[in-house]
UniProtKB/Swiss-Prot annotation:
GO MF annotation list: small ribosomal subunit rRNA binding; structural constituent of ribosome
Acidic residues composition bias: residue spans: 21-32
UniProt-listed Pfam families: Ribosomal_S13_N, Ribosomal_S15
Record PROSITE patterns: RIBOSOMAL_S15
UniProt keyword annotations, A-Z: Ribonucleoprotein, Ribosomal protein
Keyword Zinc part of the UniProt annotation: no
Any GO BP: translation
Gene this chain is encoded by: rps15
Gene3D superfamilies attached to this UniProt entry: 4.10.860.130, S15/NS1, RNA-binding
Name the record gives this protein: Small ribosomal subunit protein uS15
Chain coiled-coil ranges: none
InterPro entries reported for this sequence: Ribosomal_uS15, Ribosomal_uS15_arc_euk, Ribosomal_uS15_N, uS15_NS1_RNA-bd_sf
GO cellular component: cytosolic small ribosomal subunit
Organism annotation: Haloarcula marismortui (strain ATCC 43049 / DSM 3752 / JCM 8966 / VKM B-1809) (Halobacterium marismortui)
The family this protein is said to belong to: Belongs to the universal ribosomal protein uS15 family.
């Protein structure tokens, strides 16, 4: 599949191993995994950071290579069940942070046309995602602006 804002081809990734159950050496109780996921979320980690921490550090010293194989649920599903989900979806939050960072850079460096275009592309992606999430995970009346992004991220 092609990239969104360039004429280049997309990048190919390696495939995840086809496995129906977690490896034998990773035999941690589902409840312990879910408790650790909620604990990491309360510490302020995003769902992808939680997955990385479980892969690297694990639960009770045992690494968890794939949360969905071990529990039958995705990290975001576990967070929703325990009412610990973030206020904004992770992909939208990352794009908003990038847009705020680029806008601050553009205020200091108005002649940086390369990053001006990067900001425009990022804002386009944000508007597209807001339309996708509107009503469910984003307020129905939310529209993108720099001030709204700063407020949504809590950077005021």
């Amino acid at each position: 599949m092609a990239r969104m804002h360039t004429r280049r081809r997309g990048s190919s990734d390696s495939d995840k191993p086809a496995a129906d159950e977690p490896p034998e050496w990773s035999d941690v109780d589902e409840d312990a995994i879910e408790a650790r996921v909620v604990e990491l979320a309360e510490q302020g980690h995003s769902p992808s950071e939680i997955g990385l921490k479980l892969r690297d550090e694990g639960v009770q010293g045992t690494p968890i290579p794939d949360v969905s194989l071990a529990t039958g649920k995705k990290v975001t599903e576990i967070l929703e069940e325990n009412e610990a989900e973030p206020d904004l979806p992770e992909d939208l939050r990352n794009l908003l942070e990038r847009a705020v960072r680029l806008r601050d850079h553009m205020d200091e460096n108005p002649g940086d046309y390369q990053n001006k275009r990067a900001l425009q592309n990022t804002q386009s992606k944000i508007r597209r995602l807001i339309d996708y999430y509107r009503g469910d995970e984003v307020d129905e009346n939310f529209t993108y602006s720099y001030d709204n992004a700063v407020e949504a991220l809590g950077l005021e």
